[in-house]
Regions:
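Electrostatic cytochrome c docking/interface patches
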Residues: 22-37, 50, 67, 77-102, ...
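N-terminal, post-signal-peptide region of Sec/Tat-exported proteins
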Residues: 49-79
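Short cysteine/histidine-rich zinc-coordinating motifs and their immediately flanking basic loops
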Residues: 54-59, 119-125
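Short microdomains enriched in Cys/His and/or Lys/Arg
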Residues: 62-73, 127-139
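Surface-exposed, polar helix/loop patches in the mature regions of secreted/periplasmic/lumenal proteins
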Residues: 90-118, 125
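The canonical Cys-X-X-Cys-His
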Residues: 39-48, 83, 104-114, 148
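Bacterial N-terminal signal peptides
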Residues: 7-20
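Positively charged n-region of N-terminal signal peptides that target proteins for export
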Residues: 1-7
Length: 159
């Protein structure tokens, strides 16, 4: 193998490994189009938290986006379906049950709901994660801890 070919193989391997690590860590090099639209169109007037705590379905997000456009939000017509799909995927409905409102109002103080959705875990793992959050200052009461734990363990567990 020539020196140039060897260098090329090393560079391709390093790039592939870096891409794999980035994807494995759940980090995109660039936000997706829906997130870009949301940041440009929604968060110019609203704090992201207002979006995070709603957890709406497709019809409700469609109505919300239409209302905001009527009130002056600048969302290009072709971007509306992309924005709605993003909102449903990342800020869509959460399963009903005891603990839902606590998750919506407490966990979203620091986390996007998509973080909860993608972190499927066993009950023990959720307990550890919640304990870590408490140690980092999450405003979760002793009374609410088991309610949230039960909600997460029931609805966001490995398949």
């Amino acid at each position: 193998m020539s020196v140039m070919r060897g260098i090329l193989v090393l560079l391709v391997g390093a790039a592939t490994m870096a891409a794999t690590i980035t994807v494995a860590a759940g980090q995109n090099a660039q936000p997706d189009k829906g997130e870009q639209i949301m940041n440009a169109s929604c968060t110019t007037c609203h704090d992201l938290r207002l979006i995070q705590v709603q957890a709406l379905d497709k019809d409700a997000w469609t109505n919300q986006v239409d209302t905001m456009i009527q009130r002056g939000a600048d969302v290009p017509k072709d971007d509306i379906p992309v924005l709605i799909e993003y909102l449903v995927t990342h800020h869509g409905p959460m399963p009903d049950g005891p603990g839902k409102n606590i998750v919506l109002n407490v966990c979203t103080m620091c986390h996007d709901l998509s973080r909860v959705r993608r972190n499927l875990a066993t009950r023990e793992d959720w307990e550890d994660k919640l304990g870590t959050m408490l140690n980092e200052g999450a405003p979760l009461s002793e009374q609410d801890f088991p309610i949230v734990l039960n909600y997460l363990a029931k609805n966001f567990k490995p398949q």
